[in-house]
UniProtKB/Swiss-Prot annotation:
TM ranges: 354-373
Organism: Acidianus two-tailed virus
GO molecular function per UniProt: ATP binding; ATP hydrolysis activity
Protein name: Uncharacterized protein ORF529
Entry's localization field: Host membrane
Stored InterPro entries: AAA+_ATPase, ATPase_AAA_core, MT-severing_AAA_ATPase, P-loop_NTPase
Keyword Transmembrane: yes
Database matches in CDD domains: RecA-like_protease
Upper lineage: Viruses, Viruses incertae sedis, Bicaudaviridae, Bicaudavirus
Length: 529
């Protein structure tokens, strides 16, 4: 054939070695067609913008149909192979951009790094991309590379780039749970130093081969790596090889509601018994979100209906989510109560460390609602064990995005919390807010952390009280009866508008209705001495 004589000198980019067609496409290329991966009729062509020659080109009709459905403003549902993946917009849209860039150019200048909370679908998303593109996947974990024999680990890494990748082009290289390779080495013992040195050598080989054999040669290889580690804990050179960094957040309330609704539709059960207590759907969703459970764990619990295994204190990190705070009810001006909340969202960007004194449960709701709704940041509560060390605490935070909010509820006069807050701020850059029952602080606490006192707020009319009550009861998911609200709103107005009396009434009401007890307050966070 005439086109055989063009190979491999065609100025069009060469003869197509592989063309992947859409499963819904009626398009059949003819000899001499210039093939581009436009994401519609042709999912992928290698090399891009190549000439199709039937005798020389491998044609693959992809069997997987990918369908995208927008669930709401912030979430998508991706359907494929009788499966579905529920993803936040901030995950799915960057992934689409990266994959479409790979389709358009036929290569990427680096890889995709999926990092963040475990059990949220990082591995499943990598497999979805493989099915979407219709190309194979080379999967590598630590056991596939690491060896106890001297030099063999480096050889295994070299074999990936020199043999496996060239023999399987185009392909996806999926490096699952890459913490063993990408996390910065920390030295401390002879054994640890030796292991760190070995991994460091393997990392050097990986970085060099990735640059020389893939990026510079512009090979049709899509590298995807996943990790539960924090971004700041990864090696800088490793991160540079993965310019597409996509963060997986802990599950949102919308995610939990979606899978709960599916369960209700499947079983016909719209109430849930947890630890002997019957919960409505709303109560159940709020409870689940508060535990910080992963989507993978939650789906397993729904399948097995083993709700008694759920515990809000199963981990000392617990995400705090408002039950239902509509934007129309709660807005930025609502929490600016006579100077108590005088800061804005910019104050929560790496500079926060302070103490909130007096009426902790009300303060918690005000500040927590403000941060979540206005600043769009998650909040975490610390539920520590008796012997929790700072090192154990920090290791527990690694799966989350750095610089988020830890909210402590302290016992009276315990300034060790202030010291811990200072250490976390200084050593880890974590924003810290903690609460205590009153404003009687040790001098050390005052020096370490500025504090705010909610008892200084002056309520002069029923409307201000109503706004505050709404904020607090919505935050804790309390379903207040109208007569109870009327009593709270009118409380102490005839007695001279005593702020303390009103706040005491509200706090007592919240403690009773939300079943919060003094024993659940954090008392001993860490032994610092």
């Amino acid at each position: 054939m005439f086109f055989k004589n063009l190979f491999p000198f065609s100025i069009m980019g060469g003869i197509c070695r592989k063309v992947v067609l859409s499963p819904t496409s009626l398009f059949i290329p003819t000899n001499g067609d210039t093939i581009t991966a436009d994401g519609q009729e042709v999912l992928f062509a290698y090399p891009n913008n190549c000439l199709f020659v039937k005798d020389l080109t491998k044609v693959v009709r992809n069997k997987t149909i990918i369908q995208e459905k927008k669930y709401d403003e912030n979430h998508y549902i991706i359907y494929y192979d009788n499966k579905e993946l529920f993803l936040p917009k901030q995950i799915w849209e960057p992934v689409k951009s990266a994959v479409n860039a790979f389709i358009e150019k036929g290569y990427l200048d680096g890889g995709i790094l999926l990092y963040g909370a475990p059990g949220m679908g990082k591995s499943e998303l990598a497999k979805l991309i493989s099915k979407w593109l219709g190309i194979g996947m080379i999967q590598k974990r630590a056991d596939d590379i690491m060896s106890k024999y001297l030099g063999e680990s480096e050889q295994n890494m070299a074999r990936l780039f020199k043999e496996e990748i060239p023999q399987n082009l185009p392909t996806i290289v999926f490096m699952d749970e890459v913490d063993w390779l990408g996390v910065r080495r920390r030295f401390g013992s002879t054994t640890a130093d030796t292991a760190s040195t070995t991994v460091g050598q393997i990392l050097t080989v990986f970085l060099q081969l990735f640059q020389d054999e893939v990026i510079e040669k512009r090979l049709p290889v899509l590298f995807i790596a996943t990790t539960n580690a924090r971004l700041e804990d990864l090696d800088d050179a490793f991160k540079r090889r993965f310019p597409f960094k996509i963060y997986f957040t802990p599950p949102s309330q919308e995610m939990i509601e979606y899978f709960t609704d599916k369960y209700i539709k499947k079983t016909g059960k719209d109430t849930f018994v947890v630890h002997g207590k019957q919960l409505s759907k709303k109560q159940f969703v709020n409870f689940i979100v508060g535990t910080g459970i992963s989507i993978a764990e939650f789906k397993t619990l729904l399948e097995t209906q083993s709700f008694d295994s759920i515990s809000s204190s199963s981990t000392y990190l617990r995400r705090v989510i408002p039950a239902d705070i509509p934007e129309k009810v709660f807005d930025a001006t609502r929490v600016k109560l006579n100077g108590y909340i005088s800061f804005n969202c910019d104050d929560f960007n790496g500079r926060t460390k302070f103490h909130v004194a007096s009426f902790p449960w009300i303060s918690w709701a005000i500040l927590g609602s403000y941060i979540m709704l206005q600043c769009k940041k998650p909040i975490f509560e610390l539920l520590p064990t008796d012997n929790l060390s700072v090192e154990e605490l920090v290791s527990g935070l690694k799966q989350y995005e750095p610089t988020f909010f830890l909210m402590f509820s302290s016992s009276r006069d315990d300034y060790r919390l202030a010291i811990l807050a200072s250490r976390l701020k200084r050593e880890r850059g974590i924003d810290v807010v903690f609460f205590s029952e009153d404003n009687k602080l040790f001098p050390e606490s005052v020096m370490l952390t500025p504090y705010y006192d909610i008892s200084n707020i002056s309520f002069v009319n029923e409307e201000e009280k109503k706004q505050l009550i709404d904020t607090v009861i919505h935050f804790y998911g309390v379903e207040a009866k109208p007569d109870e609200l009327n009593i709270l709103i009118s409380s102490r107005i005839k007695g001279g508008n005593s702020t303390s009396d009103f706040l005491n009434s509200l706090q007592t009401y919240i403690l009773a209705k939300s079943k919060i007890t003094d024993t659940e307050k954090v008392k001993d966070v860490v032994k610092l001495y």
